[in-house]
């Protein structure tokens, strides 16, 4: 990571907040870590928000300590701005304003930070420095999951990049955009962005590489066809270098691709449960489980014109009743291209609408071509 890029705000703190909210109680290891981070970064505004949201008993001693530290630091920052305005040039004035903006961002005063960054942006000339401010605002928006801040600044960053942003910042923007799109269930767009940036990943101020690869696999499983999944993910040296950092992720990917459905179901259950603790993926856990089951069922059924329910249940390592209920539900919803004969216990596969349309179109085009050949033949004979 470029040393000039600060972890600001520190998104690991947002992860801690999410975990503490899930646990729903104080005194846990996560809670104690969070309080330590709040104290270290002097995050009084954030602490007050959490006290109100989570109904904590306010620690008056901590509040008094953080208030005094914030006031002292703010006074020094204001003095620095005054000194820069009176004695130095535009560059020093900008740096003083940036320091004050970073202060408000760090302590968790979102609204004041946004306003200070706006003022700093107006005093900034170099394109790269403007982009760095916008990137900080995107990270801050994602920290708070403030969709307005994120979307406005993603658009602004895109506009600035089109003016001539450097290669590294263009890639950085794609990573930020990928994570945000994934968080709002735009998985295909996120997958494309992850795959574009995997070989040139540098955004460690935002997300660590192992987690980036986990998200790449998560989105790619949902949207890539088998050939692309093999080429771009399974055989990717970048993916292989860290895939085992996430338990069961390798099993999930390989068992799905290889049609090892019993192991796939076990790995899917483990992975889906683990992402319930991820602030970006938690609300998509059930969706992912359902969609991956549908993909696996369709992949299995593509190999057969008909297959017994009992055979399929054995392949997936589940009971006959489970597979019967599951398939019936997805067939009724139009998600599986098959019919179930309840009497004989047989599944009969059918062409998808897309394949039916292609089949009919091909026949129609063939008929039209045949008619034209016959007409031409009659003309020649005459």
UniProtKB/Swiss-Prot annotation:
The keyword DNA-binding does not apply. Signal peptide: none annotated. GO terms for cellular component: proteasome complex. Keywords: Proteasome. One of its GO terms (molecular function) is structural molecule activity. It comes from the Eukaryota. PANTHER family: 26S PROTEASOME NON-ATPASE REGULATORY SUBUNIT 6 (PTHR14145:SF1), 26S PROTESOME SUBUNIT 6 (PTHR14145). Acts as a regulatory subunit of the 26S proteasome which is involved in the ATP-dependent degradation of ubiquitinated proteins. This is 26S proteasome non-ATPase regulatory subunit 6. It comes from Dictyostelium discoideum.
